[in-house]
Regions:
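Phosphate/nucleotide-binding beta-alpha loop and adjacent structural elements of enzyme active sites
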Residues: 1-221
Length: 221
């Protein structure tokens, strides 16, 4: 069968666009953060933790890794409505936690929060929907689920309460190969994570920073 030049163009272009759209569909994170992350991690069958998982699709940093690279992990979302959507949208092999991560000195089993679309704030000043969420430190959550394997990626988006979450991590027991954190307190966070043997790697967006675990050679783990 003979094709002229225009037949070839007519055939190739629609398929190219179709494949491009299909490929881009998996990248759902803001500012292509998931695409940027993959350049550094680039592996299959990994294990992630996403705190602030939303509905599991919209603005998700881990959707791509699950759908294209067969990752599984822990998805954490304190807002009940979003948590229900999260469980419906993501693979059932994930671990789903409807809790708010807190520091190790927080004693109450619950915390009051305010929810505004994609933003959840602890004791926020806005007048949006109030919710009451269960609390846990991250290390308590990992111990409860008997997570002893090395964690490939921890992505943290908690709207200004990064220090509280970090305070709830037993770094002597749990570590993360890559740590993505959204924060407006970069230098403070960088100093703290550096003390835990995390090296700053790259700024991936206006407020998203990637760190890598770099244990000292003499450190015993």
């Amino acid at each position: 069968m003979n094709f002229n030049f225009y037949d070839i163009i007519k055939y190739l272009v629609p398929n190219f666009l179709k494949n491009l759209i299909k490929k881009k569909r998996y990248y759902n994170a803001i500012d292509n953060i998931d695409r940027k992350l993959n350049k550094y991690i680039n592996r299959r069958n990994g294990f992630y933790i996403e705190c602030g998982a939303n509905d599991g699709v919209n603005q998700s940093n881990t959707w791509f890794f699950e759908k294209k690279l067969n990752w599984r992990g822990i998805l954490i979302e304190p807002v009940p409505k979003l948590f229900t959507q999260l469980k419906n949208n993501r693979c059932k092999k994930n671990i789903f936690e409807n809790v708010c991560l807190v520091g190790k000195n927080y004693k109450s089993k619950y915390i009051n929060m305010r929810y505004d679309n994609c933003q959840t704030k602890v004791f926020g000043d806005n007048k949006n929907k109030k919710i009451k969420a269960k609390t846990s430190t991250l290390s308590e959550l990992l111990d409860k689920n008997k997570i002893i394997k090395s964690i490939d990626l921890f992505t943290l988006d908690v709207e200004g309460y990064e220090n509280n979450v970090l305070d709830g991590i037993n770094f002597a027991k749990h570590n993360f190969k890559f740590f993505l954190i959204e924060t407006k307190k970069f230098f403070k966070i960088k100093k703290y994570l550096s003390s835990k043997n995390y090296q700053f790697i790259k700024k991936l967006s206006r407020h998203d920073y990637l760190f890598k675990y770099t244990p000292k050679k003499y450190e015993k783990r």
